[in-house]
Amino acid sequence: MWVSSMWWPVLFLCAAFGAVFGNEVTLPVSVKFGDGLLSFSKNTNGLFYTINEQDGLTVENSISTGESNVARNNQEYTLTECSTNEEACVEFIINDVNVILKKDLSNRASSVSHVVVNSSTDGVRIGACVELGDGVDWFGGPEAKYQLWPVQDAQWNYTAYYTKEDDAVAIAEPYWLSSQGTYLYVNPATSMFIDQNYLNEGSLCIYAENVTPYRERNYTSLEYWIGRYEDPRTAHEAAVEEFFAKPTDVPDERMIAQPVWSTWARYKIYVNDTIVRQYAQEILDNGFNHSQLEIDDFWETCYGSLTFNTSDEKFPDIKGLTDDLHDLGFRVTLWVHPFINVDCTEYYSIAESAGYFAKDVNGTILTTWWQGENASVIDFTNEAAVEWFTSRLTALQASAGIDSFKFDAGEASWAPEPAVLTGNVEESPSIYTYQFARALATFGNGIEVRTGWQTQDLAIFVRMLDKDTSWTFENGLPTLITTLLVMNLAGYGFVLPDMVGGNGYIDGVLVSTQYPSKELFIRWLQANTFMPSIQYSFVPWDYDNETVEICRTYTELHEAYAPTIIEAMNALVANGTPVNPPVWWLDPTNSEAYNISDEYLLGEVILVAPVVVEGAVTRDIFLPNGTWRDATYGTYDIYEGPTWIYDYPAPLEVLPYFVESSYWETLSAGSGAFLPSSSLTAIYTSAILALLIQLFN
Ligand SMILES: *[C@@H]1O[C@H](CO)[C@@H](O)[C@H](O)[C@H]1NC(C)=O
Ligand SMILES: *[C@@H]1O[C@H](CO)[C@@H](O)[C@H](O)[C@H]1NC(C)=O
Ligand SMILES: *[C@@H]1O[C@H](CO)[C@@H](O)[C@H](O)[C@H]1NC(C)=O
Ligand SMILES: *[C@@H]1O[C@H](CO)[C@@H](O)[C@H](O)[C@H]1NC(C)=O
Ligand SMILES: *[C@@H]1O[C@H](CO)[C@@H](O)[C@H](O)[C@H]1NC(C)=O
Ligand SMILES: *[C@@H]1O[C@H](CO)[C@@H](O)[C@H](O)[C@H]1NC(C)=O
Ligand SMILES: *[C@@H]1O[C@H](CO)[C@@H](O)[C@H](O)[C@H]1NC(C)=O
Ligand SMILES: *[C@@H]1O[C@H](CO)[C@@H](O)[C@H](O)[C@H]1NC(C)=O
Ligand SMILES: *[C@@H]1O[C@H](CO)[C@@H](O)[C@H](O)[C@H]1NC(C)=O
Ligand SMILES: *[C@@H]1O[C@H](CO)[C@@H](O)[C@H](O)[C@H]1NC(C)=O
Ligand SMILES: *[C@@H]1O[C@H](CO)[C@@H](O)[C@H](O)[C@H]1NC(C)=O
């Protein structure tokens, strides 16, 4: 194990290419910058400057222009000192590339460097690379299909950093954090690309370049902050305070406590009145609770009509159906997407002639989505379009008895590119997502979206992008945890996990279905138990009675801990702290905690260690600093963390979890309502037996 407290990322910023560095420029060798050193070098790829920061937390000198280091014969170069008491600052211009470096000296416990590089030269690409470093773990970055945790081994091949369908980047906040307590935050209004482990192996590089999907601007700008703190938790708290909006409230509490039931994975597009009624009845007959029943794809006459198909084979009397479901105690929600297919002629032509579709620079409005080869997408940055869209939804709610909505898509990439959107050009195209989520959040805190960009303030659930029915890091069960952690680090703590067992797609074909195995289904639910909500589509009773019993148990356990989930959500509202943090959150200086990707916390009081490996019936568990009560088997044994428990027995029916000791005492002193009910005992009998066998072997 190699950890260096002296480690600090090296930045090289290369303003490369063409006109800028075509001329020979004589460079200064180095300039003192705060407590670090700024040095320049040049090679055939362009100009580089490097900031080498020493461990100088106590240094508070203002910037020296380092006159003695400046090559005076450089005509195209000027250096100015712009310091105040709070900031060390240096500005220099090389040809027309204007570089401003600022260093925050006001906070003695930290060191924040602020870098702005501006150029109005055409075709310029400005980059900054952070060396990921041996033995350093990195967290954050985008939501991704192949979701790792930590993320330093991820590969990104010079890719535009905005909300997009490709690689499942539905959340793209420009924020990374290292186990050394360093954060990198980039101005979201950047024509940003990232490259990791591709052009520069071992580095995370950010770039600004004015090419599609970004709109043309007459300058290129890269602005970022590097914050350095004693550990990742302190760094994250500082970053949240500085850059993230906190949610204004918590989402719908019934959606937290009781499962959402979606028709999607089980029925795909073959939904109708009969099927919905049958589904509802099965849920009740099997003794499960529900927050809502969601009617998913395909209920419309055509995609984008927002009109129920009232044929006999579909929904002949939707109001009658929702009335009956309401009588049974269900709320009814509806899948809605922002597209209109070209063959949905009546509605398409209204939106087209009114200019409601997102268009590219040439006025093209055609796009493609998973249920429409020829379609267009509503422009959510156009107020009139939003008004038209939302008023149709409101009318539909009234006429069809719909309580709330599941809003799909919403990533900026669905618009033809480069899209011409209303609003700040610098924020285009992700401003699409920003306005999408904001417009739809007006339907209340019982909605769900699946994308976010600078929308952490909204009191709504954000769903993980569709998960696949698999055991692998390629979008399978292990990524239920890693995606949870990444979303939380990006400030989105109201995570709606995708459906239990995944979507059951066969080879990515949306309308075919392959059930998850019993084992995968149960392990998936267990992993989901202490996440903010449970969403079913495949059902336990399609397996066997044991599955039903186990699933009922963990669904109940989730509900029993709903008050704890809400407490953690209130902490996010108040302080910006993650609802489901990684285990290092409670042990931020312990290097053993950093790379644990198969455990998570609920608030700071529950530690969850699900089995996510096929066939496994034991696992190793890391407990971070603190006193923990083993709640798994109801024995409440005490463990002092940090410690490892090796080969902890966890047969199929068992989810290992631990309760922080003082919280456990609070619960025990109370009504005990939070503690697992006695119905768990039966489930655990065989597990306890397994434990005994294990102990006596
Ligand atoms: C960079 O350029 C943009 C556009 O001209 C300007 O708005 C911004 O203030 C500049 N930043 C700095 C630090 O000069
Ligand atoms: C990145 O490039 C490498 C090498 O060309 C390739 O193997 C890999 O599939 C690419 N990854 C992505 C996500 O495009
Ligand atoms: C960019 O172009 C706009 C419009 O032509 C102009 O107002 C603005 O000053 C320009 N900005 C820069 C940094 O050149
Ligand atoms: C409604 O659904 C039925 C059955 O799938 C289909 O045949 C019919 O074309 C649809 N009706 C409309 C108006 O789209
Ligand atoms: C509803 O859909 C199911 C499955 O596709 C089908 O078997 C059934 O006939 C449909 N119900 C009606 C009333 O058409
Ligand atoms: C827009 O039209 C011009 C001229 O035909 C063409 O060169 C350009 O590629 C088009 N841009 C897009 C995004 O289609
Ligand atoms: C989409 O449009 C193209 C070009 O007009 C056409 O060839 C194709 O058949 C259309 N696809 C569908 C599903 O209608
Ligand atoms: C569950 O057990 C009941 C009897 O208690 C039996 O009727 C039913 O068929 C069983 N269901 C399954 C799915 O095994
Ligand atoms: C259903 O909800 C009730 C009341 O909140 C709760 O006591 C019960 O445990 C829940 N049952 C299941 C199977 O989740
Ligand atoms: C996690 O880090 C430890 C060192 O702290 C190392 O021994 C272990 O192999 C790492 N595990 C993984 C899965 O990378
Ligand atoms: C461990 O946690 C306790 C409080 O539970 C705290 O006082 C102590 O400083 C922590 N130790 C480390 C190494 O973080």
Q: Residues of each region from the PLM?
A:
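Catalytic-domain carbohydrate-binding cleft regions of carbohydrate-active enzymes
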Residues: 24-45, 82-84, 95, 106, ...
